[in-house]
Amino acid sequence: MSSDEKLQILYCSFCGKSQHQVRKLIAGPAVFVCNECVDLCNDIIREEEIAQAGGAQKKLPTPPEIHRMLDEYVIGQEFAKKVLSVAVYNHYKRLGNQTKKDSVEISKSNILLIGPTGSGKTLLAQTLAKILDVPFAIADATTLTEAGYVGEDVENIIQKLLQKCNYDVEKAKTGIIYIDEIDKIARKTDSPSLTRDVSGEGVQQALLKLIEGTVASIPPQGGRKHPQQEYLQVDTSNILFICGGAFADLHKIIQRRTDKIGIGFAAEVRPKEDFSREASKLIKQTEPGDLIKYGLIPEFVGRLPIITTLEELDEDALMRILTEPKNALVKQYRKLFEFEGVEIDFREDALKAIAKRAIQQKTGARGLRSIVEHTLLDLMYDLPGVAAGLRKVVIDSGVIDQASPPIFIYHHEKASRKVAQE
């Protein structure tokens, strides 16, 4: 072999093999790498990813553990907790095993929560994100419009998630997004719309790819889009989407399908409470076809394979919500009063009165804080000025019903009723 021929032979800069000893030699700036070294590098990276995923899996709580942790923050809704625990566990188990070579590809299972206002839909989603320590964002479906119209683009949802994790794209890819009021973007009829529906069917169409999995182009640091801008590329394939809505009157669609109640002279006359219980039972029988009749397009329903329902909270559940969870309202107000050196005691009849009022207002658990806040407004206004010598404040049903003032107990004194200055 001549010296000129030797000079023309290229060698891998890593293993030293010549171009004749390997299948492919890739050239770079003054450097060459063979296909064997590339395969070796890929194997090393894959092994590290599997090791990291394995470590993350060890920390992933099992469905019963997720259920128990949900119990610490959310009262009732046992069936919904069970469904969510399994769904979330499978979702993150799937993410942890994506690096393994397998012919079976597991699809993402997004979730639809159906339940009345104040039943705990948002709280369940928030608590799941807290348990799993993943980024979490909430979006309101009623503010979304198609791109190019006044309102929020659907891609703004991803931007909110990025903001929650300081624009760490890799972290955002494993987050949870909760879209509230999803029932409000239902079209008015179950036939395709002939006119432009920018906040209903149009939004459903825009959400399809985002929920299923696409690469969204997001302006960095919340800026507006313009042609010369560099975008952050966010793959939504591994983001878990949980949609929630009240779906008012959905039970009527299910009732017509199941044909449980007669009409006209054949109709059974029942009290209002029975109809409420009947509606709750019917909602549990929700099928994809019922949601399509309600106004969700079939493609959108197909992207939400896991459907679970939440029950309307009764008086007992609302009373437990006031006292039992880790961040219960009563515990929060006790802490607030402790800052002033005063103890506050809510009697059981007061808790019952608060729960009854929330049921009357049809606000569920969401309305509990506003009722307590309104009740204690005057007391909290005057408390800093009268806290000296005050040991305890007792709240009973009379205070909630505004029939009597709180009971003040001073140091070295028996209980006495005092009216807060107004």
Curated annotation (Swiss-Prot):
Keyword match Signal: no
GO cellular component annotations of the record: HslUV protease complex
MF GO annotations: ATP binding; ATP hydrolysis activity; ATP-dependent protein folding chaperone; protein dimerization activity; unfolded protein binding; zinc ion binding
Binding site for ATP: P116, T117, G118, S119, G120, K121, T122, L123
Binding site for Zn(2+): C12, C15, C34, C37
TM stretches of this protein: none
GO biological process: cell division; proteolysis involved in protein catabolic process
Keywords, ordered alphabetically: ATP-binding, Chaperone, Metal-binding, Nucleotide-binding, Zinc
The organism's place on the tree of life at top rank: Bacteria
SUPFAM superfamilies attached to this UniProt entry: Glucocorticoid receptor-like (DNA-binding domain), P-loop containing nucleoside triphosphate hydrolases
Residue ranges annotated for the ClpX-type ZB domain, each copy included: 1-53
Gene3D superfamilies reported in the protein's UniProt record: 1.10.8.60, ClpX chaperone, C4-type zinc finger domain, P-loop containing nucleotide triphosphate hydrolases
Function in brief: ATP-dependent specificity component of the Clp protease. It directs the protease to specific substrates. Can perform chaperone functions in the absence of ClpP.
Cited NCBIfam families: clpX, PRK05342.1
PANTHER family noted in UniProt: ATP-DEPENDENT CLP PROTEASE ATP-BINDING SUBUNIT CLPX-LIKE, MITOCHONDRIAL (PTHR48102:SF7), ATP-DEPENDENT CLP PROTEASE ATP-BINDING SUBUNIT CLPX-LIKE, MITOCHONDRIAL-RELATED (PTHR48102)
Subunit architecture: Component of the ClpX-ClpP complex. Forms a hexameric ring that, in the presence of ATP, binds to fourteen ClpP subunits assembled into a disk-like structure with a central cavity, resembling the structure of eukaryotic proteasomes.
Family: Belongs to the ClpX chaperone family.
Protein name listed in UniProt: ATP-dependent Clp protease ATP-binding subunit ClpX
